[in-house]
Amino acid sequence: LDVKNYLFDIEAGIKVNEYIESAITLDATTIKTKFDKIAPILQTIHASGKELRGEFAPFEEIKKYESLIEEKIPYANYKAVREEVFSLEKRLANLGVDRKSCHIDLVPENFIESPQGRLYLIDWEYSSMNDPMWDLAALFLESEFTPQEEEAFLSHYESEQTPVSREKIAIYKILQDAIWSLWTVYKEEQGADFGDYGVNRYQRAVKGLAYYGGSDEK
């Protein structure tokens, strides 16, 4: 799945991996031509049965960033939106969280392709136990899939070993936008400048809540 690792020293903070000569990094456009390669990678991860260290808990992540942010959170109607976001916790519990090994951070740039056509998935910093639908939500959000592209990918991914819940994907999209919008506020307090990235993700979370609230899947 990943490139070969030669050195991994936790104490020194050093990691040395194989260098893939002339590798191509995917982007939000090229990733949509690789469904037949990406789906098996995710199926392998999600059906592996491996127990990864740590568990990615979305609602705890929200609380974590809220506690780290020193100033007032600058997003419109944040308190009301937060209540709606946290109301999803019970719904997720009712649906059931399928605890599997996950990559967590499926931005297109974490997929690289060798000149021979082999696809690698890199940057496992956030990998932990979570519901596989989190990974699918991340894949769709980070590369801005259309509904038609989502269904096309799911036709490659869905199987008896890797079932799909479209409702959970919708919920995890909202949670991801909420988390990364808060992450942006925290980082900008530390001096970073992400432009309108944070507010755009927050606004998309709000739209997602409105759409989910009107969905007949609930």
Predicted regions and their residues:
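ATP-binding pocket architecture of kinase catalytic cores
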Residues: 1-57, 68, 72-79
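An alpha-helical support segment within catalytic cores of ATP-dependent transferases
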Residues: 50-104, 115-116
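ATP/Mg2+ or Mg2+-diphosphate-binding catalytic cores
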Residues: 76, 80, 182-218
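Pre-DFG segment of protein kinase catalytic domains
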Residues: 101, 120-123
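Active-site activation/catalytic loop segments of kinase-like enzymes and analogous catalytic loops
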Residues: 133-161, 174-192, 204
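Start-of-helix signal in alpha-solenoid helical-repeat scaffolds, especially tetratricopeptide repeats
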Residues: 167, 171-175
